[in-house]
Amino acid sequence: MELQVVGANALTVSETTFGREFNEALIHQVVVAYAAGARQGSRAQKTRAEVSGSGKKPWRQKGTGRARSGDIRSPIWRSGGVTFAAKPQDHSQKVNKKMYRGAIKSILSELVRQDRLVVVDKFEIDAPKTKVLVQKLKELALEDVLIITASLDENLFLAARNLYKVDVRDAQGIDPVSLIAFDKVVVTVDAVKQIEEMLA
């Protein structure tokens, strides 16, 4: 199959990478796993066993008129432990390489079908200026965009850093969440070739 390149000849690409059927279930599973892997999982609370305080019975069982109590660290007391205390945990989910690659291919194919993938010969700017990048994006009628280059262009990265709906990645740094998060995905010809090799 062929992809149209802005201001250049069409680019022949693999049908298995850019012409794959949309697999919503697979994409959902991979995106959920990716988001789960980004969680810190460092939350921690103390149980009644871990809270500081004496284990002595505060007052005798009977005869005081007060409610019976055996421990000042009880969860129903102020400063007591937490009943079902949260503990640090690893939220990551296992995703096979084949599944991950399949999800990326499915997303790329859907971007092509929806005309959201814009292929350009090159995407460069002369200086790390946000103003210059904004002007270049206006020329291409782009606003909410992910820019993918073969290798990370420092000028481009620095210029895009202060723009709300613009992100710059190299071909190695693409992930399913960023691919579906933007309205358009601009990718250079060299990056397309690199992505094809990576997903082969």
From Swiss-Prot:
Keyword Endoplasmic reticulum: no
Gene3D superfamilies (UniProt xref): 3.40.1370.10
GO biological process: translation
Positions of the UniProt region annotated as Disordered: 43-71
UniProt GO molecular function: rRNA binding; structural constituent of ribosome
Keywords: Ribonucleoprotein, Ribosomal protein, RNA-binding, rRNA-binding
This protein's GO CC annotations: ribonucleoprotein complex; ribosome
Transmembrane segments annotated in the record for this chain: none
Superkingdom, natural source: Bacteria
NCBIfam families: rplD_bact
Description of how the protein assembles with itself and partners: Part of the 50S ribosomal subunit.
Function in brief: One of the primary rRNA binding proteins, this protein initially binds near the 5'-end of the 23S rRNA. It is important during the early stages of 50S assembly. It makes multiple contacts with different domains of the 23S rRNA in the assembled 50S subunit and ribosome.
Family to which this protein belongs: Belongs to the universal ribosomal protein uL4 family.
Name of the molecule in the record: Large ribosomal subunit protein uL4
Naturally occurring in which organism (per UniProt): Aggregatibacter actinomycetemcomitans (Actinobacillus actinomycetemcomitans)
